[in-house]
Swiss-Prot record:
The presence of a 'disulfide through disulfide knot' structurally defines this protein as a knottin. Belongs to the neurotoxin 10 (Hwtx-1) family. 15 (Hntx-3) subfamily. The modification Leucine amide is found at L81. The lineage of its organism: Eukaryota, Metazoa, Ecdysozoa, Arthropoda, Chelicerata. Residues 22-48 form a propeptide. It comes from Cyriopagopus hainanus (Chinese bird spider). Disulfide bonds join C50-C65, C57-C70, C64-C77. Expressed by the venom gland. SUPFAM superfamilies: omega toxin-like (SSF57059). This is Mu-theraphotoxin-Hhn2j 2. GO terms for cellular component: extracellular region; host cell presynaptic membrane. It is found in: Secreted. Monomer. It comes from the Eukaryota. Its main location: secreted.
Length: 83
């Protein structure tokens, strides 16, 4: 029962992706689709002037992007949850 539900859901997702791909005329379709699904801009990291999640940083220099903070322990940018 679980396997058939999973296969049905996977089939619907595949149908959606194929339908969207057939209508898309851009060559950067996979990047565009992933960007829309995850609502993040990780593919254009070179364009921004700040460091994103997982990038190395120096604590106290404020190099990380908004909503990120430099970890004193690990020395990389992580998501700041406001604590």
């Amino acid at each position: 029962m679980k396997a058939s539900m999973f296969l049905a859901l996977a089939g619907l997702v595949l149908l959606f992706v194929v339908g969207y791909a057939s209508e898309s005329e851009e060559k950067e379709f996979p990047i565009e689709l992933l960007s829309k699904i995850f609502a993040v801009d990780v593919f254009k990291g070179e364009d921004r002037g700040c460091k994103g999640f997982g990038d190395s940083c120096t604590p106290g220099k404020n190099e990380c992007c908004p909503n990120h903070a430099c970890s004193n322990k690990h020395k990389w940018c992580k998501v700041y949850l406001g604590k």
